[in-house]
């Protein structure tokens, strides 16, 4: 039995703006259960004596000198935009529905 309900999967799909059929909701509920089980198994194995890591090898940043250079004119950039308002790109609102 899945611990993920089709209602939960439908809510996640809605947040991601993905339309799913009822069959897909059922399928993804099962797939999410498999993923959650795998994460639970890893959590059981990882002990307090194992240090947390984000990369298997050490990483260092390679910085370049911050040199001022000419940039594009705002008008030129906005001229190629599909829509602009008040000197800025105008885009459709996507947040605030939930």
UniProtKB/Swiss-Prot annotation:
EC number: 6.3.5.-
Thylakoid is among the record's keywords: no
Catalytic activity of the protein: L-glutamyl-tRNA(Gln) + L-glutamine + ATP + H2O = L-glutaminyl-tRNA(Gln) + L-glutamate + ADP + phosphate + H(+); L-aspartyl-tRNA(Asn) + L-glutamine + ATP + H2O = L-asparaginyl-tRNA(Asn) + L-glutamate + ADP + phosphate + 2 H(+)
Keywords attached to this entry: ATP-binding, Ligase, Nucleotide-binding, Protein biosynthesis
Pfam families from the UniProt entry: GatC
InterPro entries: Asp/Glu-ADT_sf_sub_c, GatC
Gene3D superfamilies: Glu-tRNAGln amidotransferase C subunit, N-terminal domain (1.10.20.60)
Database matches in NCBIfam families: gatC
Free-text function comment from the UniProt entry: Allows the formation of correctly charged Asn-tRNA(Asn) or Gln-tRNA(Gln) through the transamidation of misacylated Asp-tRNA(Asn) or Glu-tRNA(Gln) in organisms which lack either or both of asparaginyl-tRNA or glutaminyl-tRNA synthetases. The reaction takes place in the presence of glutamine and ATP through an activated phospho-Asp-tRNA(Asn) or phospho-Glu-tRNA(Gln).
Stated family: Belongs to the GatC family.
Full protein name: Aspartyl/glutamyl-tRNA(Asn/Gln) amidotransferase subunit C
Encoding gene per record: gatC
């Amino acid at each position: 039995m899945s611990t993920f309900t089709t209602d939960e999967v439908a809510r996640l799909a809605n947040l991601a703006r993905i339309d799913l059929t009822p069959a897909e909701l059922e399928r993804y509920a099962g797939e999410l259960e498999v993923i959650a089980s795998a994460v639970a198994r890893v959590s059981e194995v990882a002990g307090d004596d194992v240090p947390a890591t984000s990369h298997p090898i050490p990483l260092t940043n390679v910085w370049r000198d911050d040199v001022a250079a000419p940039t594009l004119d705002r008008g030129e950039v906005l001229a190629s935009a599909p829509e602009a308002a008040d000197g800025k790109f105008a885009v459709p609102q996507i947040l605030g529905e939930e």
